[in-house]
Amino acid sequence: YFYNYLKKNKKILFNKTNIIPNILFVSAKSLSKKRSLKIPKKLWLKNCLLATRLKEVDIIIELIGGSEGIAKKLVFEALKNKKHVITANKALIAKYGDQLAKIAEKNKVNLEFEAAVCGGIPIIRSIKEGLIANNINKIYGILNGTSNYILSSMDKDKLEYKDSLLKAKSLG
C-alpha cells in the first residue's frame, strides 16, 4: 500500500519537498505470498538487511512490526550504516527508542516514528520544532491512538474495557 501511495503521489511529494522519491527495493517476510500490489519483480529484495549496506539507499522505511527479529535488526543496522529510518513500529520504539535515538544522533541521521505515536497525530514534530526552546527530556502518558480510542469509548459510550478493546481491534 505504501509503495502504491508513493508511486501515485510522486508529483505531490515533489511539489511539497522538492524531492522525487525513488523506491529502490521492496522486501517482505514472505516473498511468495500473493499480494494485490503491482510491484515489479526486479524491486523485490530477498534479504532486506542488504539494503542497509548499499550506498544508493538513503532511507529505510520499516513497516514490519514487532520489537524483535528482522524489524529490530533492520532498524539498528540501517542507523549504524548511516541510513535515515522511518517506522510506524510502536513495539520497537517503545522498547528500543532511546537506544535507536542515540545511534541516530551519533550517526547524524533521522529516526522518524511519528506514525507510531498518538495515532499518527503530528505530536512529535510539534514538540521537536514548536517547543524547541523548552528543555523537554521525556514525556510520560498515553500517546497511542488505540489506547486513546479505548479510553474515550469507555467514557463516552460507557463501554466496558473488554468491549471497547474488541471494538478497537475490529476497527484496526
Regions found by a protein language model. Give the residues of each.
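Rossmann-fold NAD(P)-binding glycine/threonine-rich loop
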Residues: 66-81, 88-129
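Short, glycine/acidic-enriched loop or turn micro-motifs at the edges of active sites
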Residues: 61, 65, 92, 148
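General beta-strand structural signal in soluble alpha/beta enzymes
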Residues: 44-46, 61-62, 86-88, 111-115, ...
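Glycine-enriched alpha-helix->loop->beta-strand junction motifs that scaffold or abut catalytic
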Residues: 81-84, 145
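Active-site catalytic pocket residues across diverse enzymes, especially alpha/beta-hydrolases
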Residues: 6-10, 96, 104, 131, ...
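Core active-site phosphate/anionic-ligand binding loop and the adjoining beta-turn-alpha structural block
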Residues: 97-98, 110-172
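N-terminal glycine-/serine-/threonine-rich beta1-alpha1-beta2 phosphate-ribose binding loop
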Residues: 1-81
